[in-house]
């Protein structure tokens, strides 16, 4: 299960993106061909987020949380320049947040048959999202955001993750609205 970050003193340099989850090797040529940010540092310690906040403007700005696509096995919070939130934050007068979390076997391998301590193993990638949403709720006001006005949005696999968060009572206090863009199918063929 994810571990919440320990507080630190002073200012934390956040000028570079944090590591992304380990990626499926066969997808790397596709992403590289498209010029996407897929050659970033990969790590199991990839639970990080990016925040864009405009200068000035209204207090208690709406918060828009982006959950990337890529199924539950690939992608990252800044894989395309169009997913960086600077322009939307600036022109929409919102706080834009994107989340990295564990994917593939690091986030969804089911080990519960090996004992009680592994009962939550198939859901640690989703648990990463819940912990990120909790952090946003507790800290977004420091960036000018309103923790009572949070919309989560995801496309493709990210849409499926938004659907998962809608079903979790642990996630419910941390957002008020959700947008699913081509989310997960629910039939057995998926």
Where are each of the predicted segments found?
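Non-catalytic accessory segments of hydrolases
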Residues: 1-126, 147
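Alpha/beta-hydrolase-fold catalytic nucleophile elbow
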Residues: 100, 153, 168, 179-182
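Short, well-ordered amphipathic alpha-helical segments that serve as non-catalytic structural scaffolds
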Residues: 129-137
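A short beta-to-alpha transition loop/helix N-cap that caps and shapes the active-site region
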Residues: 105, 160, 184-190
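Alpha/beta-hydrolase fold nucleophile elbow
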Residues: 62, 121-124, 136, 142-156
């Amino acid at each position: 299960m994810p571990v919440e970050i320990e507080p630190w003193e002073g200012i934390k340099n956040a000028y570079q993106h944090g590591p992304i989850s380990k990626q499926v090797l066969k997808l790397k040529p596709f992403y590289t061909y498209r010029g996407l940010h897929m050659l970033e540092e990969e790590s199991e310690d990839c639970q990080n987020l990016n925040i864009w906040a405009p200068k000035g403007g209204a207090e208690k700005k709406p918060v828009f949380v982006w959950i990337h696509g890529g199924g539950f096995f690939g992608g990252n919070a800044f894989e395309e320049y169009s997913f960086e939130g600077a322009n939307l934050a600036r022109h929409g007068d919102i706080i834009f947040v994107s989340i990295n979390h564990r994917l593939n076997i690091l986030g969804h391998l089911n080990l519960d048959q090996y004992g009680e301590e592994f009962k939550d193993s198939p859901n640690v990638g989703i648990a990463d999202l819940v912990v990120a949403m909790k952090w946003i709720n507790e800290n977004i006001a420091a960036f000018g955001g309103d923790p009572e006005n949070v919309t989560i949005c995801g496309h493709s696999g990210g849409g499926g993750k938004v659907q998962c968060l809608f079903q979790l009572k642990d996630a419910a206090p941390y957002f008020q609205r959700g947008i699913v863009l081509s989310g997960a199918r629910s039939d057995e063929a998926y």
